[in-house]
Every structure is written in C-alpha cells, then in structure tokens.
C-alpha cells in the first residue's frame, strides 16, 4: 500500500501546507523544515498543543523554522506539480510508520511522526535551543494517553475532553467563576442524585436565565472546596461543548467517533462528571441515514452507570425534544430551577458585584443593584431574574466605562467650536474688508480663550483618567493576590497564604484607599468623569429597553399623579366625571392597592361622537408615557366577521399568517407599556369579548404560538356610541346612568361588564366647552406657525365666532375643526404661499362686521 494512504487526515493536511510553503519559498523539494514550519503555523496542531502545555512561546521556534527553510536551495521555475519529497522527509515518514506500528496504530499520526524524529538534525536545530526534548516526548505521550489511531480521522480525537470540553473544576480552582449564591437546595439535590446507585444523572430544568449553568458552577466550586460527600471528592466536572464536537465533522461517522472517544475517555478516567448544557441538542445530533444520534451513543454508558452526566435545558425544549425519547428520559432525574425572588436576585447581584467592578473598572453602588433587581422585575416582563438584572448592571457599567475611556463631551464641544472658528477665520481672510478684519480680531481673542480652556480640560481629563488607570491596576493586583492566597491555602502552603493576607494585601488595600480618597477630593472640585454606576444609570438602560421615560421610574410620582385630573382637563373639555373616574383607577394602581396581575385600568367610554373619548385616550398616553405613540389603537369595525377575530392573537397553526403573530399580542409584546384603545367596540363580533375576558381578568393573553403576553402594565380603553341617543336626550345624571346601564345589558354579557373597572359616560358638549376647545386647537396651530417664524394671534371675539360656527350638539367638537380650517388655517396658508408674510411677521385674526379678517404686522 502507498505510504501516503497510511497518513491520518491531519498528517495529510500538514504535508499540503508544507507543499504550499515550499512553493512560496521557491524550493523544489518539500523538506522537514517545511513540515515543522507548517505544524508551528497551525494553532490546532498536536505540536502546538504540546508547546502550550509546556508554556513555551512558539514565535521564536517559528522564526527558527523559517531560517532553516531559507538555507534550502531555491529555484526560479518551481511549479506545484513538479514538487517532490526530500530524502530526509521520506526517511522520516518511514521512521514514523515504524513508530506507529510499535504503538499499535493503524495510521501514521502527527505525534508519532514527531516522536520518531526527535533526534533528526533539522528537528534538533529548530527545537533543541528552546525545548527540553525528553519533556516534549513525555508531553506528546500524555496527550495521546491510551488512545490508538484506528482511522484516518483518529488524531482529530486525541485528548478529546481537552478539545471538546471545558474543565469547570479547574476554572473554580483558578477562582475565575462567579460566586453562586442562594442555590443550596438545587446543588444539594444534584449531589444527592449523583451519589445514587442508579438513575444518578440529574437534569436541570428551568426558564432561560434563571441560573441553571450557575448551579453546576456552584457544584464545581464545592468540589474544589471539598464541601461535597466523600464519593464526589476529587471528581472533575467537565462541560461538553456540543458545537465544537459537531463543527468540522466532515465525513460520515466522524462525529460519532469523536463522541465515542469522549465517552471512552470519561470511562477510563473514572472520576469525571460530564455536564451537557442545552442537552436537548443530543437528541438527533449527528443522525443521518445509517448512523446513530448522540443520545443513542450515550444511552448504553448511562444505563450501565459508566457515565456520570448532568444535563440542563429549558422546560419547553425538554418537553419538545427530550421527553419523546422515553429510554433517555428515564435515565435522568429532573431538578426544577425556579426563578429567584427579587431579594434572592439582589443577593446574587451583590455576590457578583466585585467581578463586574473588576471587569469594567467602575464602582457599582448598592442602590444600583437594588434598582436593577426591582426595575427589571417590574419593567422587563419577557425575561427572567437574575439574568435580566445582571444584564442591566453589565450594560450600565459598560456605558460608564465607555464614557471614561472616551473624550468628555465638554472637551469635544470646545474642539468642535475651535475647528468652526478656524474655518470661519480662513474664509474671512480670503476677503479683506474692515468688517472682516474686525471679526478676525474677535475670533483670535475667542480662540485664545478656547485654547486655554481646552488645555485646562485636557489636563483635568488626563489627571482623572490616570487615577482610574491606577485604581484598575491595583484592583487587578488585589484580585491576583486573593487568587494566589486561595490556591496557597488549598495546597497547604499556609506560610505563603499568611504572607499574602497579612503583608501584601493590606499594603495594596492602603494604596487603593488613598486613591479613592484622592478621587473624592477631586469630586469636591467637580470632575469631568464619574466612576460609579447609580440607580439613574440603571433606569437609563431600562428606559432604552422598555421605552418608559426615566423620570417615571425614579422620581416620586405622588405630585404628578395627584395632578392627573388638571393635566387631563387641559386637553379633554367638559368631561369632569370621566376624568375623575380615570384618575381614581390610576391613583389606586400607583398607590399599589390594585391587583398587580390585572391591567392598570379598564374602562368603557360611552358617549356621542366628537365629545373627546379618543382624545382622552391619547392625552392619557401622553401623560403616563410621555409619548402619544404608546397608544395601540385597534379599530373594531375590522373585526365584525368571526374569522377576523383570530387576527388579534394570530392565525392558528397551518393557516396563512401564523408566523406573523397577532395584531394585539405582537403590539403589546413590543411595547408592554401602552394604552390599548378598542375603538367602536359595539361593531366587533361577540367572540372578541371572549378574548378580552382573559385580558381584563388575568392581565395575560396567550397568542396562537402559545406565548403568554403580559397586559399588567397596560390601560384598556373601549369606546362605544351605544346609548348615545339616551345620553343626548336625558338631562338628569342619575336617570341617564340608569338608562345607559339598561342599554349596555342588551349589548354586552354580564361577565364582560363585571370585569371593567368603570363605565365612563361622556357628556354632550355645550357652547362654553366648544369655546375652550377653540383655545386648545388654536394653541396647536400657533405652535406650528411659530416653527416657521410666524406669530399668529386670535381675538376673543373671533374665538367666540368660530365656536358659534363650529358648534353642533349632535356631532360634538368635530365640526369645530372644519370651522377653524376654513376661518383661520386656509387664510394663513394663502398668505404664506403668496409670500405676503415672511419669517418674523405677526398675523392677527379678529372679528369685523361678523366676519374674520386678518391684519399683518411686518417685522
């Protein structure tokens, strides 16, 4: 058989790389120097793995290999097809074949090639100055272990666990894992299952972000600290990287071979617990025609108790994938990992705070941690604690770090101003006039002042930055010393631990305290930078994520909420009873007296057209969320047919539009803090009210995909013209309410009416109300005109005239808008388009002889 066919895939790839290097270097023959250069250039090669294990820098070795290549004879006419293998390389391959046979391998692997040629002159020339050859051989053999190369992909699977796994116990030993707080019950349950005789494989089930992986890291920390039962002491906890295991498996059977090698390695070691995160991925992984999936490879070892495995997945994926394989399911014992409470999440945040501070080089206040736990729980409803709270802290700290490392805003503004003045000065110097020369002198003075200010700010910025840099260096040093002390204690070197704890650490802490004191003194005089993450920083991040204005979360809302009635009355005229009813519900919510699981408020607005039902909803959105876009308006005339009702929650599976989601559910998922306006609700199909029952009662609605959408931070408003004739006809308030209730019973079921917080009746508008609305509408027009630089005024007589023209007791305020268009806006538009008025002019609208006329005051 051809020797080339006996090479492993890695050895073949090395030869190909060596051929490319020979071609690039204009060498006619592929030599051993090319082979060693190719191996050193490949980060994944067994040679580099061995060098990394020996802590040897490969840069110098690579340079040495290049210099050996440079010594080889060169040719100007080298073609790829003309390349040949040198005698030395051919001899080296034969030696490697002999070493492979002696070792029981069926194919020649890279490690056997290296071991066979340790005494070869080129190897000695490159490696001997920097590498202990005997130690190097030992390292290569330790990487191989007991494995035999039985296929061409065999050396891809050497030291499988180190390639495809992460040693969590080693990370715990190095103190690089975050502390695990408040998960004692789950860790104890996991240890209890692990020491059972059978079915001793725990599987952690919980929502994304509740801390399943952290529970496993907690076990690794306990193993290192010897705080586990005797049978679990000296165990190694290895996290299997499924993506690395699958990635690059080009040939059929290669994935199975890799996994089988991992299982065999775990069996041989005898003291390894395997952790598979997202364990549902093993069901079906690698399966194709004529091959097994990962689950079937693991089952026999799990059944015999040869493989200790901890799994972790979400409840949804466990049900969807894992439970389908009953044989696999029965080999695992479930442990539920529940979402921690706000107080538990706060304890977790306090535990990981030092690591976050060290990473970002900022201080994190305790108030920020409290804000992160509370605000994330209240405002980020589609994710889970503690993950969402940690994300808030992390992002706020990253934002602050970016500000520290970037140029301060004040300095940027001054630099920009200087640049603008320099450009202006250049332009003025090109046209010499007395005015220009005077302006140039002014610019020179201003530039002088600005440059002084710039230098002062730059000095201040550098001084502040240097303090931060020194604090960061000291924190890193302190962290390193604490780790060193911990390792010394574990290895029993108490003299070294005492020297660090009572000698070095106090010195470093004193330096840190001095720097903090220096920073506090600098803060008293005012600083450009800040180094503390505060509750305001956290609220800013929540504001960006959820769209809730920052001041709503942090300022005391008492005064604002107490003034809700006067605020609504500015835009909604003549509806005092309606405003009071809405204000009462919102005050109950803000005082924390209502049911937190239900919407903030749910109202049915009744009244004739044009009395302000929709306007009230818009004003409420503006008041509560500082944004009129927080109003989700659903026109119920679009849901008159039974088949259209499903659009609210999404089409059922198999129907067109299933992937798009529901009109209502998707809108609230994207903007959980909204006012939902169901306009003209009496036109909707009765099935719509069955959907609304769930929203009004539980504050939740499940869409067609089974996802629960939270409505607890919404205000539900339904408008209707039902009984508007009775509202217009009956003057007595009590009689009107009675008549309206009777009319409602004819349209809506009692269970729907019972779930509403209030039925609000809007009164018909009188002439006095219409006059007030003229003022509101005209203010809006005057504001738009002022943006164009035009002042507009309207006399009191003109206002009353427009109110009279636009008053209609049947149609409410809508005809008034048309009257204002005709009498004021149309005339103003003509004046602007005819260029009769310009920026800075004033236009007065007044009543003269029963008609509105205009008077223009030029600037």
From Swiss-Prot:
Indicate the family of this protein. Answer: Belongs to the ClpA/ClpB family.
Q: What is its main location?
A: cytoplasm
Which sites bind ATP 1? 206-213
Region entry NBD1, spans:
159-339
Locate the residues binding ATP 2: 607-614
The protein in question is named Chaperone protein ClpB
Q: Which SUPFAM superfamilies match?
A: Double Clp-N motif, P-loop containing nucleoside triphosphate hydrolases
Localisation: Cytoplasm
Organism of this sequence: Helicobacter hepaticus (strain ATCC 51449 / 3B1)
Q: Where is this region: Repeat 1?
A: 7-72
Q: Give the quaternary structure.
A: Homohexamer. The oligomerization is ATP-dependent.
Q: Provide the Clp R domain boundaries.
A: 4-146
A GO BP annotation? cellular response to heat
Transmembrane residue ranges: none
Q: Where is this region: Linker?
A: 340-547
**Residues in coiled coil:** 390-524
Molecular function via GO: ATP binding; ATP hydrolysis activity
UniProtKB keywords: ATP-binding, Chaperone, Coiled coil, Cytoplasm, Nucleotide-binding, Repeat, Stress response
Please give the record's comment on domains.
The Clp repeat (R) domain probably functions as a substrate-discriminating domain, recruiting aggregated proteins to the ClpB hexamer and/or stabilizing bound proteins. The NBD2 domain is responsible for oligomerization, whereas the NBD1 domain stabilizes the hexamer probably in an ATP-dependent manner. The movement of the coiled-coil domain is essential for ClpB ability to rescue proteins from an aggregated state, probably by pulling apart large aggregated proteins, which are bound between the coiled-coils motifs of adjacent ClpB subunits in the functional hexamer.
- Provide a GO CC annotation, any one: cytoplasm
Q: Where is the signal peptide?
A: none
Question: Taxonomically, which superkingdom?
Answer: Bacteria
């Amino acid at each position: 058989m051809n020797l080339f066919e006996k090479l492993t895939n890695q050895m073949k790839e090395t030869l190909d790389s060596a051929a490319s290097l020979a071609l690039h270097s204009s060498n006619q023959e592929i030599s051993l120097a090319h082979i060693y250069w190719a191996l050193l250039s490949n980060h994944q090669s067994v040679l580099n793995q061995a060098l990394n294990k020996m802590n040897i820098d490969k840069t110098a070795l690579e340079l040495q290999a290049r210099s050996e290549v440079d010594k080889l004879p060169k040719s100007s006419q080298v073609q790829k097809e003309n390349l040949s293998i040198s005698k030395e390389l051919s001899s080296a391959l034969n030696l490697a074949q002999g070493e492979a046979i002696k070792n029981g391998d069926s194919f020649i692997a890279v490690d056997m090639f290296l071991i066979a040629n340790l005494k070869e002159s080129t190897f000695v020339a490159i490696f001997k100055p920097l590498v202990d050859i005997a130690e190097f051989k030992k390292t290569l053999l330790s990487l191989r272990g007991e494995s035999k190369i039985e296929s061409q992909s065999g050396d891809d699977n050497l030291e499988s666990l180190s390639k495809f796994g992460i040693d969590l116990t080693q990370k715990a030993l190095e103190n690089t894992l975050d502390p695990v707080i408040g998960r004692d019950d789950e860790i104890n349950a996991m240890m209890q299952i692990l020491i059972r005789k059978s079915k001793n494989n725990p599987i952690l089930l919980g929502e994304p972000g509740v801390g399943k992986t952290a529970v496993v890291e907690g076990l690794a920390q306990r193993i290192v600290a010897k705080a586990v039962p005797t049978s679990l002491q000296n165990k190694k906890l290895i996290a299997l990287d499924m993506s690395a295991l699958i990635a690059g498996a080009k040939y059929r059977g290669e994935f199975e071979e890799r996994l089988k090698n991992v299982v065999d390695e775990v069996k041989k070691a005898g003291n390894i617990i395997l952790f598979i995160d997202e364990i549902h991925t093993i069901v079906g992984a690698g399966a194709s025609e004529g091959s097994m999936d990962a689950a079937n490879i693991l089952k026999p070892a799990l059944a015999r108790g040869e493989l200790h495995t901890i799994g972790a997945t979400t409840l949804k994926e466990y049900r969807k994938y894992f439970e389908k394989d009953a044989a696999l399911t029965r080999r695992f014992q479930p442990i539920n990992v529940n979402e921690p409470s706000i107080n538990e999440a706060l304890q977790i945040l306090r535990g990981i705070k030092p690591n976050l501070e060290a990473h970002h080089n900022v201080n994190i206040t305790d108030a920020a941690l409290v804000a992160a736990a509370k605000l994330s729980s209240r405002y980020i409803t589609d994710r889970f604690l503690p993950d969402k709270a940690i994300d808030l802290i992390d992002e706020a700290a990253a934002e602050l770090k970016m500000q520290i490392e970037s140029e301060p805003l004040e300095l940027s503004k001054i630099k920009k101003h200087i640049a603008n003045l320099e450009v202006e000065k250049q332009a003025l110097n090109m046209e010499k006039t007395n005015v220009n020369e005077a302006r140039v002198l002014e610019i020179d003075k201003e530039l002088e002042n600005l440059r002084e200010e710039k230098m002062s700010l730059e000095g201040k910025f550098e001084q502040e930055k240097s303090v931060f840099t020194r604090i960061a260096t000291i924190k890193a040093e302190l962290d390193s010393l604490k780790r060193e002390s911990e390792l010394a204690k574990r290895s029993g070197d108490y003299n070294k631990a005492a020297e660090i704890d009572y000698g070095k650490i106090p010195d470093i802490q004193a330096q840190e305290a001095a720097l903090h004191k220096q920073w506090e003194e600098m803060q008293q005089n005012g600083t450009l930078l800040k180094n503390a993450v505060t509750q305001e920083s956290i609220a800013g991040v929540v504001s960006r994520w959820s769209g809730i204005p920052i001041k709503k979360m942090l300022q005391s809302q008492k005064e604002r909420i107490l003034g809700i009635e006067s605020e609504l009355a500015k835009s909604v005229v003549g509806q005092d009873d309606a405003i009071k009813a809405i204000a009462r519900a919102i005050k109950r919510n803000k005082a924390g007296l209502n049911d937190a699981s239900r919407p903030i408020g749910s109202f049915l607005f009744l009244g004739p057209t044009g009395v302000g039902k929709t306007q009230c909803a818009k004003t409420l959105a503006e008041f509560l969320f500082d944004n009129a876009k927080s109003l989700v308006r659903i026109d119920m005339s679009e849901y008159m047919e039974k088949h259209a009702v499903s659009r609210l929650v999404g089409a059922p599976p198999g129907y067109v539009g299933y992937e798009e989601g529901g009109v209502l559910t998707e809108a609230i998922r994207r903007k959980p803090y909204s006012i939902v306006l169901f306009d003209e609700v009496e036109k909707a199909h009765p099935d719509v009210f069955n959907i609304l029952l769930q929203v009004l009662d539980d504050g939740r609605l499940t869409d067609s995909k089974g996802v629960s959408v939270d409505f607890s931070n919404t205000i539900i408003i339904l408008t209707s013209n039902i009984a508007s004739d009775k509202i217009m006809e009956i003057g007595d308030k009590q009689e009107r309410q009675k008549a309206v209730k009777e009319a409602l019973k004819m349209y809506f079921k009692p269970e729907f009416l019972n779930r509403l917080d209030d039925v609000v009746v809007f009164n018909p508008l009188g002439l006095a109300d219409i006059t007030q609305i003229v003022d509101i509408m005209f203010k809006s027009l005057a504001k738009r005109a002022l943006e164009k630089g035009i002042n507009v005024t309207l006399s009191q007589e003109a206002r009353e005239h427009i109110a009279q023209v636009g008053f209609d007791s049947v149609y409410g305020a809508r005809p008034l808008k048309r009257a204002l268009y005709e009498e004021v806006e149309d005339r103003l538009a003509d004046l602007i388009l005819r260029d009769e008025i310009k920026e800075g002019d004033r236009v007065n609208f007044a009543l003269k002889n029963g008609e509105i006329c205009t008077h223009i005051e030029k600037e």
